[in-house]
Regions:
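Short alpha-helical segments and helix-capping/turn motifs at coil-helix boundaries
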Residues: 25-30, 84-90, 132
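Glycine-rich anion/phosphate-binding loops
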Residues: 75-95
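Short, hydrophobic/glycine-enriched beta-strand segments
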Residues: 8-15
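Short beta-strand segments
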Residues: 12, 45, 101-105
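A charged helix-plus-loop insertion that forms the helical arch/lid used to bind
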Residues: 60-77, 116-127
Length: 322
């Protein structure tokens, strides 16, 4: 069974933790509930932290003279400076965080799709952007997994978020010990996961570890970390997953019956046609790794990039995009 590091996640406090929304309610969230045994959460409500209280009159972002201001229409109070100060102060205290889950469309926590109004009260929305706190998070931590709770209901987005989160947290644990042997093992165990994400960056990581320039170990880890973040900037394409599955399949070609090989090739085609999920292929490949005792493959994180308990039953049986 894989061992995982325990990531630290900043989360909007109104999601599953506290009844601190403007209307005095809490928002139940199954993803956050499922994550709780596996991560350390840092709940925060920026609006409460700047003294707005619960319940409270709503706030909104208003564009004024080309600048976004955070205001409370009912009181005409401008809380922009308070929110900016809190955001800066708070984010400076969490340098070792691994990711963020923030409330979508919130004028404080939202990272996208937050309505920006042309004026107070009944003025129409003129565009969309980030909330003040959410925008500060993206500005300071763009290299980390940052998501809104609404988007995490999408399997592809959720899987990408979880994969980045748990891989980065494990890397940080290795980085803390500054042990090259551990870094080499990390690279080896993640070979096929990294290949699925970005084969160019995967090879670049290998060259960094080879350290032909005899850089100091601190420089090696610094360069490795920067490239690792770049590797995870987008989710794998289905063509990359097909390529990785074909590489793994190559371990068994001389050991399988013709019918088994033909069946797997048919499944690869069905995956490419969006008829079956990637998990159907990985289950078969892992069963062969067990059957033929391929120890190198059994260490590959590609088969379980995050705790299996976080895979929801509703995710199974879906097509290629899942």
């Amino acid at each position: 069974m894989r061992q995982f590091a325990k990531p630290t996640i900043v989360v909007s406090k109104c999601l599953e933790f506290d009844a601190c929304r403007y209307n005095g309610e809490m928002i139940p969230d199954v993803t956050i509930r499922n994550l709780q045994p596996f991560v350390t959460f840092i709940p925060v409500c920026p609006e409460v932290e700047i003294g707005l209280g619960t319940p409270r009159e709503t706030i909104r972002i208003v564009e004024e003279n080309g600048m976004n201001r955070l205001v409370q229409p009912s009181t005409r109070e401008d809380v922009t400076e308070k929110m900016e100060q809190f955001s800066n102060d708070f984010l400076q205290t969490i340098s070792d965080v691994d990711g963020f889950i923030l409330k979508n469309r919130s004028p404080s926590c939202g990272t996208r799709d937050v309505k920006i109004y042309s004026g107070f009260e009944k003025a129409p929305a003129k565009g969309k952007g980030a909330g003040l706190f959410g925008g500060a998070v993206v500005k300071n931590f763009s290299h980390l997994p940052i998501e809104e709770e609404g988007r995490l209901s999408n399997f592809i987005i959720r899987e990408h978020f979880f994969t980045r989160l748990f891989t980065i947290a494990y890397y940080k644990m290795i980085k803390h010990n500054k042990n090259m042997k551990d870094l080499v093992s990390f690279q080896s165990d993640n070979k096929y996961l990294f290949m699925a994400y970005n084969q160019v960056k995967q090879k670049e990581l290998g060259r960094i570890i080879a350290n032909h320039k005899n850089e100091k170990i601190e420089v090696v880890f610094e360069n490795y970390e920067k490239t690792l973040y770049e590797l995870f900037m987008r989710a794998p394409r289905y063509t990359s997953n097909v390529n990785v599955c074909e590489h793994i399949f190559g371990y068994f070609k001389t050991k399988l019956k013709k019918q088994e090989k033909d069946h797997f090739i048919e499944l690869l085609q069905k995956y490419a046609e969006k008829k079956i999920p990637l998990s159907s292929l990985l289950t078969i490949l892992k069963s062969w790794a067990i059957r033929f005792d391929e120890k190198y493959l059994l260490r590959q994180t590609y088969f379980e990039p995050y705790p299996e308990a976080l895979v929801e039953i509703s995710d199974s049986g879906k097509g290629r995009d899942y």
